[in-house]
Amino acid sequence: MSMQDPLADMLTRIRNAQMAEKSVVSMPSSTLKVAVAKVLKDEGYIAGYQISSETKPLLSIELKYFEGRPVIEEVKRVSRPGLRQYKSVEELPKVRGGLGVSIVSTNKGVMTDRAARAAGVGGEVLCTVF
């Protein structure tokens, strides 16, 4: 079976690993996954990430916990292959009143909703994280 939505697979692996209280989760790497991992690290949702290039590139994400609880409380895929969600800068959603972040793919790269608003660009809303 082929993987139809690699980003949804990444988010599901992170969610499952945190429920199992794993410290590191690995997955096949791609440019988009690395860009999303960079945003998650910059926002403090993960401790770090690393790309190992053996035969196939693997992305390893070091998960972050606070007082025994996962830092990522909720992660949801918004735009999916069957229903893409493109938003202008005015329509970019705020997650939980601004406490969480939306990760947006713009023509200036993958960034948070706050960074996209500051840059004055809209784009495809990939996922929300709280």
From Swiss-Prot:
Record InterPro entries: Ribosomal_uS8 (IPR000630), Ribosomal_uS8_CS (IPR047863), Ribosomal_uS8_sf (IPR035987)
Cellular component, GO, one term: ribonucleoprotein complex
Annotated source species: Pseudomonas fluorescens (strain Pf0-1)
Similarity-based family: Belongs to the universal ribosomal protein uS8 family.
Function statement: One of the primary rRNA binding proteins, it binds directly to 16S rRNA central domain where it helps coordinate assembly of the platform of the 30S subunit.
Name this polypeptide is given: Small ribosomal subunit protein uS8
The organism's place on the tree of life at top rank: Bacteria
Pfam families xrefs: Ribosomal_S8 (PF00410)
Statement: the UniProt record of this protein carries the keyword Zinc-finger: no
PROSITE patterns, per the entry: RIBOSOMAL_S8
GO biological processes: translation
Subunit (UniProt): Part of the 30S ribosomal subunit. Contacts proteins S5 and S12.
Keyword vocabulary terms for this entry: Ribonucleoprotein, Ribosomal protein, RNA-binding, rRNA-binding
Gene Ontology molecular functions: rRNA binding; structural constituent of ribosome
